[in-house]
UniProtKB/Swiss-Prot annotation:
It comes from the Bacteria. It is an enzyme of class 4 (lyase). It catalyses: heme b + 2 H(+) = protoporphyrin IX + Fe(2+). It comes from Synechococcus sp. (strain WH7803). Its EC number is 4.98.1.1. It is found in: Cytoplasm. GO terms for molecular function: ferrochelatase activity; metal ion binding. One of its GO terms (biological process) is heme biosynthetic process. It holds the Pfam family Ferrochelatase. Keywords: Cytoplasm, Heme biosynthesis, Iron, Lyase, Metal-binding, Porphyrin biosynthesis. This is Ferrochelatase. The gene is hemH.
C-alpha cells in the first residue's frame, strides 16, 4: 500500500509571550509579505517592524491567555484527519507545516522524508487562495523541493483552494445556524462575515483570486444556511486586520460594524469566514475589539460563530479533499501557486529592482519610502516616531 504524507499548511503563532517578537520578525522577513529592492534591508526592516509592534501584540496575546492555540488545534486536526483517512483504508500520515513559527515547513519535509512516504498531498488550511497565505506556503515548499533529490522524486498533489467544497460549506452553515437559532428573532438575525483582508493591489494588479473566492464562498454558505433554516437572513461581508496606510479590500470590518450599529441591528451573528481555527484574530480581534466596537455602536446582541477546529463534518470534508486528490492527477507546486495574470513571482531567494507592478504588489514604493523616512529620522533626530516616543 502506498504511504501518503498529508502536509497541512498554516500560518503558525507564538505559543508564549516571549515568542511574539521572533514570530513577528519571521512574518515580516518573508519577501512575499514585504519586498525590498535591496536584500540586505529585509531583516533590518523586519526587526524594526517587529520591535515596534511586539508590545501591542504581546498585550493582545496576554488577553487570550498568553499565547496562540493555533498549533495545538492544528495538530489535533492533523491527528483526526489521519485517523479518518486510515479508517478509509488510506495509509496516511499527517504533518503540520507552519509558515512563521514551529513546527516550520522544513521540519514537516524532513519528517515525511524520514518516514519514507511514497507520495505527498499538500492541503492548505486556508479555504481561499491568496498570495500571502497559501501562495507563500506553496512557494516555501517549492524552495525546499528544489535541489532536494529525495523530495523532488516524491509525487505531489497540491490542493489549491477548497472554498466551494460541499463539506466545508455545509459545516460552516451548520455552525452559523446554531447561533442564528439563539437569536430573539432568527429570521432577522444579521449574519456578518468577517474575512481577513489583503491589500487591494494584490487583487487588481497581481490577479489574486482571494476576493472572488471569498464572495463566492459567502453566497454558497448563505444558500446552504437558507436551506437549513427555511428562510433567508440578511448578511454582510467585510474585511478585517488591515495594517498600514495602503488601501485594503473593503468594506472594512470596523466601518461595517459601525453602520450596522447605527441601523439599530438587534442580533448580529459574526462569522470568521477565512479562519478554520481559533487564534488571535478570532479570540482577541473579533471577540474583544470588534465586540466592544459593535456594542458601542448600538448592536444589542453580538454572537460569534465558533471556528471549525475539529468539528466532525469539517474533518470529514478535509478527508474527502485528500481522497479526491489522490484519485486525480498530480498537481505541482508551480501549478498551485500560479496566478491568472502575467505578474512574475520571483523565487524567495532572488530579488528585483524597479518600480513595476510586481514590486508594487509585494509592497513597492511604500516600503522603500517608509524605510528611507525611518533612516532620515534616525539621522535628523526629528519625526513622528520621536513624537510618539518610539525613538
Amino acid at each position: 500500500m502506498s504511504r501518503v504524507g498529508v502536509v497541512l499548511l498554516n500560518l503558525g503563532g507564538p505559543e508564549r509571550i516571549q515568542d511574539v517578537g521572533p514570530f513577528l520578525f519571521n512574518l515580516f522577513a518573508d519577501p512575499e509579505i514585504i519586498r525590498l529592492p535591496i536584500p540586505a534591508l529585509q531583516k533590518p526592516l523586519a526587526w524594526l517592524i517587529s520591535t515596534l509592534r511586539s508590545g501591542k501584540s504581546q498585550e493582545a496575546y496576554r488577553s487570550i491567555g498568553g499565547g496562540s492555540p493555533l498549533r495545538r488545534i492544528t495538530e489535533q486536526q492533523a491527528r483526526e484527519l489521519q485517523s479518518l483517512l486510515r479508517q478509509r483504508g488510506i495509509d496516511a500520515t499527517s504533518y503540520v507545516a507552519m509558515r512563521y513559527w514551529h513546527p516550520f515547513t522544513e521540519s514537516a519535509v524532513a519528517d515525511l522524508k524520514a518516514d519514507g512516504m511514497d507520495q505527498v498531498v499538500v492541503l492548505p488550511l486556508y479555504p481561499h487562495f491568496s498570495i500571502s497565505t497559501s501562495g507563500s506556503s506553496f512557494r516555501e515548499l517549492q524552495r525546499l523541493r528544489q535541489g532536494d533529490e529525495s523530495f523532488e522524486k516524491l509525487p505531489i498533489r497540491c490542493i489549491r483552494s477548497w472554498f466551494d467544497h460541499p463539506g466545508y460549506v455545509r459545516a460552516m452553515a451548520e455552525l452559523i445556524a446554531e447561533e442564528v437559532r439563539q437569536s430573539d428573532d432568527p429570521t432577522q438575525a444579521h449574519v456578518f462575515f468577517s474575512a481577513h483582508g489583503v491589500p487591494k493591489s494584490y487583487v487588481e494588479e497581481a490577479g489574486d483570486p482571494y476576493q472572488k473566492e471569498i464572495e463566492s464562498c459567502t453566497d454558497l454558505i448563505m444558500k446552504e444556511l437558507g436551506q437549513l433554516m427555511g428562510h433567508d437572513n440578511p448578511f454582510t461581508l467585510a474585511y478585517q486586520s488591515r495594517v498600514g496606510p495602503v488601501e485594503w479590500l473593503k468594506p472594512y470590518t470596523e466601518e461595517a460594524l459601525e453602520e450596522l450599529g447605527k441601523a439599530k441591528t438587534n442580533d448580529l451573528v459574526v462569522v470568521p469566514i477565512s479562519f478554520v481555527s481559533e487564534h488571535i484574530e478570532t479570540l482577541e480581534e473579533i471577540d474583544i475589539e470588534y465586540r466592544e466596537l459593535a456594542t458601542e455602536a448600538g448592536v444589542v446582541n453580538f454572537r460569534r460563530v465558533r471556528a471549525l477546529d475539529t468539528y466532525p463534518p469539517f474533518i470529514e470534508g478535509l478527508a474527502d479533499l485528500v481522497t479526491t486528490s489522490l484519485e486525480g492527477p498530480e498537481v505541482s507546486l508551480d501549478a498551485a501557486a500560479e496566478l491568472p495574470t502575467k505578474v512574475k513571482l520571483y523565487p524567495q531567494e532572488k530579488w528585483e529592482w524597479g518600480w513595476n507592478n510586481s514590486s508594487e504588489v509585494w509592497n513597492g514604493r511604500l516600503a522603500m519610502l517608509g524605510f528611507s523616512g525611518f533612516l532620515l529620522e534616525l539621522i535628523s533626530g526629528h519625526g513622528p516616531l520621536h513624537a510618539l516616543g518610539l525613538l
